[in-house]
Amino acid sequence: MRMKQGVSRRRMLALSAAAGSLAICREAAAQAEKRIERLDPALDAIISTSEPIVDLATNLGGTANVEGPLWWSEGGYLLFRGTDLARWKYVPGQGISVFKQNTNAANGITRDPQGRLVACEAATRRVTREERDGSITVLASSFQGRRLNFPNDIVVKSDGAIYFTDPWTGPAAVQPPGENDQIFAGVYRISPDLGTLTLLVNDFLVPNGIAFSPDERVLYINDTARRHIRAFDVAPNGTLARQTDRVFADLSGPEPGAPDGMKVDSAGNVFCGGAGGIYILDPKGKKLGRIVHGYQNTSNIAFAGDDWKTVYFCTRTSLGTFKVKIAGVPVPAVKKS
């Protein structure tokens, strides 16, 4: 009996050691998939190739992509859309909790110059603003008598003008457009006084991520279907100088992943998902590096932290982070002089 007990203990120890070794091997394999690729020496001023890429939450399940991250600087937490379409909150060092259950499947969110939350609501096909008392103000729901398609991502200029993408996807793509639906995918501007909705461009296949250069003179918009980012100079009246339309960067490749949400740092470098990970591009569109996080897609990105040098990224079912050396453009945007 003693011998059997002794063998049992040894076997348990051996199995425990084997399980531990297997876990370590799996973790090492997963970490081996994560790397920072230097495509140009200029990357070193932005991020170290030895910078850890950290998973904060994985295998979140659900039917929707993890999306729409936004750092709430006053509270020191990250808001983002969870896989159940609710708005979740991540507090560094504490974890994830549900922040708001019913958001009408809001995707891209940001803040206006007064600090109020502005959202693209997919389920209701509108752009809204949440007031201080929690009430909702509808900022845009139709254009020229036809409903918006599927407001997706959004950015607010420092003068209060709101720019958003409206791809022909989601609920609007389930069936052919009716007489009250748009017949194109558009990019729009809501005037600072909220009185005018202007169609800026309508020749994208799937307009998605949208971001300004730090001086707000250039607007970047990516086209997920074409796998590239386009850039436009911003005219004095806030519309786009169409003659300046150019392909800023092609992010296609053999690996999974396409341009989706994107953000810009204070030096003008663009962070955007693409084939194989997150690309870092200089202000001229040159590829400086790629963050390979080991997931098939990057749905969105946000700068965060007290110094805006923490980057959070969302994938299909995960949330991750890494640090950079150059601060991102703060949200809300600061009025340009």
Question: Which sequence ranges carry the predicted segments?
Answer:
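N-terminal secretory signal peptides and thylakoid transit peptides that target proteins
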Residues: R2-G20
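Blade/loop signatures of beta-propeller domains
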Residues: Q31-P52
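A short beta-strand motif characteristic of beta-propeller blades
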Residues: V54-T58, I96-K100, T137-F143, T196-V201, ...
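Beta-rich, blade/repeat-based domains predominating
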Residues: N59-Y77, N102-E121, R126, Q144-I162, ...
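A short loop-to-beta-strand structural motif that recurs across blades of beta-propeller domains
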Residues: A86-W88, R126-T128, G186-Y188, H228-R230, ...
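Short, conserved, GDST-rich strand-edge loop motifs in beta-rich repeat architectures
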Residues: T165-Q182
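Short loop/turn segments immediately following beta-strands, especially the blade-tip
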Residues: F232-L240, V324-V329
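Blade-level signature of beta-propeller repeat domains, shared across WD40, Kelch, NHL, RCC1
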Residues: A304-S337
